[in-house]
Amino acid sequence: MHLSSRKRVFVSFDFDHDEDLKNLLVGQAKHPDTPFDLADWSIKEAISGNWEQKARSRIRSVDLVIGICGEWTHTARGVGIELRIAREERKPFFLLWGRADRNCQRPIGIEPTEKMYRWTWDNLRALVGGAR
């Protein structure tokens, strides 16, 4: 895929429980025909001071935000805040069901009607391409 047509993506995830899932997405981003580049991801630091300002700056610089949902995502305040910022900045986002064999949770502030998509290569490519 031509580099200029690839989307710049920010990945929002629960650092305490789902860093392995972010690493899987990093691996998929290296696939030769991937439609995206991982530009940035969640910041591992306390939510205080200028954390939100840093997150907003990172999210502003991308085309799309991917929220990875795991079993404890509803307890990760930062994920909910990052997705709220994505909305405020009018950045499209979608949620991936991070663990196929587990009960994954939406972040705080995300409506139960917001779909979590199965994490498959075909789904990921389609979702990055705008199929939602």
Each language-model region and where it sits:
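Glycine-rich, charge-decorated loop segments at or immediately adjacent to ligand/cofactor-binding or catalytic sites
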Residues: 101-115
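Short beta-alpha junction loops
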Residues: 93-103
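A charged, well-structured terminal subsegment
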Residues: 125-132
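Conserved N-terminal substructure of TIR/SEFIR domains
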Residues: 1-61, 99, 132
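Arginine/glycine-rich "motif VI" loop of SF2 helicases in the C-terminal RecA-like domain
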Residues: 30-34, 85-92
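Short, well-ordered alpha-helix to beta-strand connector turns
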Residues: 62-63, 113
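Conserved TIR/SEFIR loop-to-helix hotspot centered on a Trp-containing motif
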Residues: 71-89
